[in-house]
Amino acid sequence: MEELRTLPEYLKASNADGTVILQATATWCSQCKAIAPFVEKLVKQFPEAKFYKYDTDSAGDIAQELGVSQMPVFTIFQNGDLEETVTGARGKALEETIRKVYKGEVRQGDGE
């Protein structure tokens, strides 16, 4: 998963065509680490979606732009429009939310 480090990188990624999922994370965030394997499954399950992460400590301007105050937070864009936000390490909720927005091929995955 590519890491966004600057506000211009975020703007380019979030305005891309298709489905874009941004994950707010931090090195000290235990829930972020706990959900990481599940997110990797989602990357494979939704191959046409673009997944990015950003560290709220080193890329605080991105977190501020999105109003992130807790983690993990997943912000889902479709064709440049912010569609949904999922807060917390809630794998099933994240998967269901991506399914609502995503328009591409879905590969079979067992979710959790």
Where do the model's predicted regions map?
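Local sequence-structure signature of Cys/Sec-based thiol-disulfide redox active-site neighborhoods
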Residues: 3, 11-41
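Structural micro-motif
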Residues: 66-75
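Non-catalytic, surface beta->alpha helical segment in thiol-disulfide oxidoreductase systems
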Residues: 76-111
